[in-house]
């Protein structure tokens, strides 16, 4: 599973992070201390569950939960707080569980188990129907073999050839798709497009940037042992240090 811990207290974040790691059911656990950091993480990636404190510095966790609930691919929410007075409101927001500080390993394990059951039920719900399963398989095959990407902008769907896509990047909550024909701006997260254009030509070079390597024009050495890429449309992107190893491997630069 993939999770985010949202708490403005570093000690609480670190404690919960440690306890979740002991359960060993998570492939990724990110941490955020406020609403803006949380929303930024949700733009870049998909998560299964958010452990959310209620009293945050910049906004109430209840308000954040309401925003998350409206998202297309909303993760499950577990409130993790020192106060039990908001429990009713939390469950009105469809929280899957509500755990109190100080945290107990057994209680956290129970909450995680609820999420696993819910994720499993979602899978079973789809697999129970032959028709649904068949359609899902067909859709998955289309996604894998499709050479076009539909992009919806202002209630109009543009059909773009994958070969024409130069880069996809996120800035201030807006996802921009640069193509050889035009640039398109949407509110879909980067992970949405990463899944749809999962081919050997596309790679992440930064948490906020996905590029088509066939449109790289030049590679220059940059600060902190990284690279700057100039694309065929003359846009420049930096390869972040955390993606350097993968980039070198995919470009045969090792």
Swiss-Prot record:
<keyword id="KW-0805">Transcription regulation</keyword>
<feature type="domain" description="HTH LytTR-type">
    <location>
        <begin position="149"/>
        <end position="253"/>
    </location>
</feature>
<feature type="compositionally biased region" description="Polar residues">
    <location>
        <begin position="129"/>
        <end position="138"/>
    </location>
</feature>
<feature type="domain" description="Response regulatory">
    <location>
        <begin position="2"/>
        <end position="116"/>
    </location>
</feature>
<protein>
    <recommendedName>
        <fullName>Sensory transduction protein LytR</fullName>
    </recommendedName>
</protein>
<dbReference type="GO" id="GO:0005737">
    <property type="term" value="C:cytoplasm"/>
</dbReference>
<dbReference type="InterPro" id="IPR007492">
    <property type="entry name" value="LytTR_DNA-bd_dom"/>
</dbReference>
<dbReference type="Pfam" id="PF04397">
    <property type="entry name" value="LytTR"/>
</dbReference>
<dbReference type="InterPro" id="IPR011006">
    <property type="entry name" value="CheY-like_superfamily"/>
</dbReference>
<feature type="region of interest" description="Disordered">
    <location>
        <begin position="120"/>
        <end position="143"/>
    </location>
</feature>
<comment type="function">
    <text>Member of the two-component regulatory system LytR/LytS that probably regulates genes involved in cell wall metabolism.</text>
</comment>
<feature type="modified residue" description="4-aspartylphosphate">
    <location>
        <position position="53"/>
    </location>
</feature>
<keyword id="KW-0238">DNA-binding</keyword>
<dbReference type="GO" id="GO:0003677">
    <property type="term" value="F:DNA binding"/>
</dbReference>
<keyword id="KW-0902">Two-component regulatory system</keyword>
<dbReference type="GO" id="GO:0000156">
    <property type="term" value="F:phosphorelay response regulator activity"/>
</dbReference>
<keyword id="KW-0963">Cytoplasm</keyword>
<dbReference type="InterPro" id="IPR001789">
    <property type="entry name" value="Sig_transdc_resp-reg_receiver"/>
</dbReference>
<dbReference type="Pfam" id="PF00072">
    <property type="entry name" value="Response_reg"/>
</dbReference>
<dbReference type="InterPro" id="IPR046947">
    <property type="entry name" value="LytR-like"/>
</dbReference>
<keyword id="KW-0804">Transcription</keyword>
<keyword id="KW-0597">Phosphoprotein</keyword>
